[in-house]
C-alpha cells in the first residue's frame, strides 16, 4: 500500500515511472504505462512496452484516443474491443461483457464513479454495442442529480404561521414593514387580538409584532439588519481572539503531517556527516560493548607484560649472582696457587744449594 502524488492510497504501481498511482491519475499521466500491483513489481520488475491485448500492436504515444484502459488496467485499441465484442454471443447483456484477458467487465457498473470509469464510458459511447446502455446510464444519472438539487435547495418564499397556517412574507422584505404600518394605522393592538382568522388570512399575526423592532429605528437601514450584524461581528471577534493560538497551532500541525506524508516516498540528499552521526546513534550500544571489551583486553595484556618483566629480572639477577660467585672462587683459587708455587720454589732453592 502506497500513496499517489494526489495523496490517495493505492496498491497499483507504474513500472515505467516506478511510483504509486491511483485510478484517477492513471488517466492523465499514465495512459499507456505498464501498470500492475506493487507486489508484482517486487516479485518481478522486468516489463515490456505496453501493447494491445487483442492485436498485440503498439500504441501511439501522441494520440490519447488510440488506447483505452479498462478498470482492470488492461490496455486495448477501441477498435479491437469493438471487434472482440462483435464476436461474443448476442444473448449476453452488455454490462457483463468480460475483458479479453480477465473476467472483469469491460463497462464499469453504474455505481462506479471515477475518472477512469468516466473515460471508459466516454470512449465507448460512440460504439454501437454500448451506445444504448450508456445513454440510459447518463439519463438515469442526470435524473438523480436533479432530484438531489431539488432536495438540497427547497423553495422558501416566506414563513408559515404555526398557529393559523397563514403564510407570512419574509421579515427582510419591504412588504413586511408596509404591512406593519397598515396594521398600526388600523389600531390593532398586541394584547387585544382575537382569533378572527377567516377575514384576515393575508394579514400578519399581530402577536409577532412584539418581536419586531420599532420603525423609528429603521431610518438608516430599512431592513433592520444593522444591529444583528454588529452582534455577530462582536461574537466573531471574540471567537477569533480566543482561539487564534489554537487555530494557528492546528494549522502548523496539519502542515507538519502533510509534509511528512509528502516526503515519505521522496529521495533525500545524502549528507555523509549526518549519515555517520545517525549510524553512531543507531549502533551506540554495540560501540560501547566493543570499547569496554577492548579496554579489558588492554589491561590484561599490560598486567601480563608486567609479570613477565619481573620474572625476567629475577632470572637475570640470579645469573649475575652465579657469575659473580664463580669469578670470586676463581680469583681465590688463582691466588692460592701462586702462593704455593712460590713457597715450593723457596723450599726447593735451599735444597738445590745443599
From Swiss-Prot:
InterPro entries: ZFPL1 (IPR039043), Znf_RING (IPR001841), Znf_RING/FYVE/PHD (IPR013083)
Zn finger spans (RING-type): 52-103
Cellular compartments per GO CC: Golgi apparatus; membrane
Extent of the signal sequence: none
Keywords, comma-separated and alphabetical: Membrane, Metal-binding, Transmembrane, Transmembrane helix, Zinc, Zinc-finger
Stretches that traverse the bilayer: 287-307
PANTHER family: ZINC FINGER PROTEIN-LIKE 1
Protein name: Zinc finger protein-like 1 homolog
